[in-house]
Amino acid sequence: MKPWIWTLLMATALASCGEPPLMAVSKEVSMDGWFSEERLLFHWDVQDTLQRQDLLLDIRHDQTYPYSNLYVFLTYRYPNGRSRMDTVECTLANERGEWRGSGFGDLVDHRFLLQSGIQFPLRGRYGLEVRHGMRHDPIPAVANIGLRLEAHQGDSRP
């Protein structure tokens, strides 16, 4: 193989390797359905209160998921015992019904930016409780819900 081709391949491989997440956890959801009272709990520890981070929600479902979106209720829990609630609409399909995420086989993966460039104000253990906020209960075909914490990359995210 010519040296310049090898160099190009190595440069491409290295460029595609991103920084690993600070935390990545995925919770499995029963394929029998996700009931609204089923709360998925995520925890992580923060020591550096100056580092800017991005908080992302991962959703994996199969092709039979019957809706174009998924509403989730989020409860953030802080080390000092306080909490904050939020509601997020995750758009999973476009107007034509085509999934916006990527997938392999029957599964489709989506990643949603919940908070960008946040600085956690306190050292200690944080938590996030996730439950669905859809009208129908249970909702079918959701396989996993995940949470990722990554070093903030500036304005490079969509």
Label the model's feature ranges:
Residues K2-L9:
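Sec-dependent signal peptide recognition
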Residues A13-S16:
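C-terminal motif of bacterial Sec signal peptides marking the signal peptidase cleavage site
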Residues G18-P21:
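Bacterial signal peptide processing site
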Residues E38-Y67:
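Post-signal-peptide N-terminal segment of Sec-exported extracytoplasmic proteins
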Residues L50-L57, I118-M134:
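Noncatalytic modules at the cell exterior or secretory-pathway interfaces
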Residues Q63-T64, D109-Q119, R131-V142:
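Short acidic/polar inter-strand loop motif in beta-rich domains
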Residues V72-R77, R135-P158:
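Exposed low-complexity, polar/acidic, P/S/T/G-rich flexible segments that act as propeptides
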Residues V88-Q119:
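An anionic, turn-rich surface loop/hairpin at beta-sheet edges
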